[in-house]
């Protein structure tokens, strides 16, 4: 009786609760479930969806999709997979959801069965009939093909995905990562398709520029084939398609009767992190000494100052030495090159005196300032004067690019001017029209509302910048950055990250650190880009800042691979390479598709002389990003350490074909050619590297060493005298100068230069040579005791 009375007392309360529930005659159970998912009440949504699926027999496919969707969003992928695989499916979204969850669970056979009707690689007709689902299905197919190393087919699937939905950013990243190009033509097709116009131009060629690991590289016997891979790469990009502006003008004349409509992008998968490489000094046995310079005209000033005028740098006594350094290797057009403004006060770690050198600012910021201030004057014509030191003061971090020479890699180098680099990387066809057209890259008026149209214009512009960065075409990237509005650069994280990546790729580590550090401070919750920030600090040997960054990331974002890459960089800078390897492996465990972690792991394994594991790590990076030139370069260095020079030459040539603007790789190629006895070819490669930056001290030192190996003593002496005037605190220069004088019979000058080298490097930290050099160098009086 007591229980009955209690139940009677409760019933009115429940009735009152249900009576307070808002009644809406048009509201369905699907609306209630979606409302719960919007409020992140996934367990409640799953309960209602399961109840709805078990009781609704009229529209079982829709209720099944809703139930499976709730499970997937709640990260209950095993339950979602079990549900979908236990029933007969119908409909594009159900098949795609089963394929997606199977791929996430690494059930590739089930993924293929859901995606393809037959085992022929053709996506189901039901999926293809729904363009929004087809775009995601094609992208998933591309990822599967990439895992199976079918790069050309993966590129084609990415193109199909973009044809269906151009707003899939992950599809654009994947498309460029597989070697795609000419995004402007893809946007043009989207514009015409959006307006119901037939695209009568043929589809763009989908030929991949990715070199196959089974295809041998270009012959190294000829200097032309080795020294000019950039022409081959740039010729692939050339096309004769019309510009975006011309296509828009055509479509504006034919859209007067078209009903305005707005396409809505589908749910985009999480953005794939672009590969962010560590530069070549990561695996070199000697790193350059970083200068503590304050670049007043750097890119970072864009984020703190409204605009800055271009100033002419003051010249010091060092400029005369640098002018002498340039006299014999600069191109005839070098006097007309565009240069950058800014003054840097450079402090050498090994010298107590301070020297003021004019330092250039990036063309991107110079052009951006010119765009913001249309009345700005033309940039003054002058030379870059910032040099790079040869070696690091830390002997344990000093790693040479070659195991058999005492050469030096340049890592703290500056980017060539616009005219110098135009011969190497001409503007891409996809952005050629935007370089000469001040009008925004807009789409047809009347089809999209103004806000959508504005966002689409910015999206298209950012996509073209991504294409320029992915193809290492800095001239096009500079022009596109200059055309962006200042507010977009200041307030868009993706644009800042792209700007930081561009600085990082060109070894402008100080500017990269300033840009990405400012981004991290403004948006502390964002982790993307911190792997580049930590690597920039590694190059600058900023131990305290790197330690603080890694501490913050590993505390607040332990489940992100970028955090453990930063921790690995921190341990590597402190020469704790075993702990660094553990951190990189942890990053790979968190994200098995993070190619940058594989690259860093390979570099650390090279330092530990675990060459087979390092090669496997680089190959894993190439599976994920076949155009990652750092992975090709690292693989070449592994073979170089194994003294497999021909295989190393082939791999490094592939890296140069992908990125022809990397001077360190050209120096390494020249060292391999020198070991093979091809001195002339090696000199051609060094001269090509010097055309990118005539003031690169490391490249010039390598050129002097090659002249010494070729017994061209007079030319070597002239080159070293110029280097001595430009870099009077580098022990390597005086050491090689002493060897030249000894060979020429100038014993007193040889002893004098040996003495200066010992004063600059009393503990021999810079004296990193192998046994071959020692046996060949010292003390053979019959070779060095008489003039040659």
Swiss-Prot record:
Belongs to the APC3/CDC27 family. Residues 217-229, 366-378 have a biased composition (Low complexity). Residues 241-273, 293-303, 319-360, 391-414 have a biased composition (Polar residues). Changing residue 531 to G: In ax212; mat phenotype. Pathway: Protein modification; protein ubiquitination. Residues 198-436 are annotated as: Disordered. The lineage of its organism: Eukaryota, Metazoa, Ecdysozoa, Nematoda, Chromadorea. GO terms for cellular component: anaphase-promoting complex; cytoplasm. This is Cell division cycle protein 27 homolog. Probable component of the anaphase promoting complex/cyclosome (APC/C), a cell cycle-regulated E3 ubiquitin ligase that controls progression through mitosis and the G1 phase of the cell cycle. The APC/C complex acts by mediating ubiquitination and subsequent degradation of target proteins. Developmental role in early embryogenesis and the metaphase to anaphase transition in oocyte and spermatocyte meiosis and mitosis in germ cells. Required for embryonic anterior-posterior axis formation. One of its GO terms (biological process) is metaphase/anaphase transition of mitotic cell cycle. Keywords: Cell cycle, Cell division, Developmental protein, Meiosis, Mitosis, Nucleus, Repeat, TPR repeat, Ubl conjugation pathway. Disruption phenotype: RNAi-mediated knockdown results in defective metaphase to anaphase transition (Mat phenotype) and embryos that arrest at the one-cell stage. It comes from Caenorhabditis elegans. The APC/C complex is probably composed of at least 12 subunits: apc-2, apc-10, apc-11, cdc-26, emb-1, emb-27, emb-30, mat-1, mat-2, mat-3, such-1 and gfi-3. InterPro entries: TPR-like_helical_dom_sf (IPR011990), TPR_rpt (IPR019734). Expressed in the ventral nerve cord. Pfam families: ANAPC3 (PF12895), TPR_16 (PF13432), TPR_8 (PF13181). PANTHER family: CELL DIVISION CYCLE 16,23,27, CELL DIVISION CYCLE PROTEIN 27 HOMOLOG. Coiled coil: none annotated. The keyword Chloroplast does not apply.
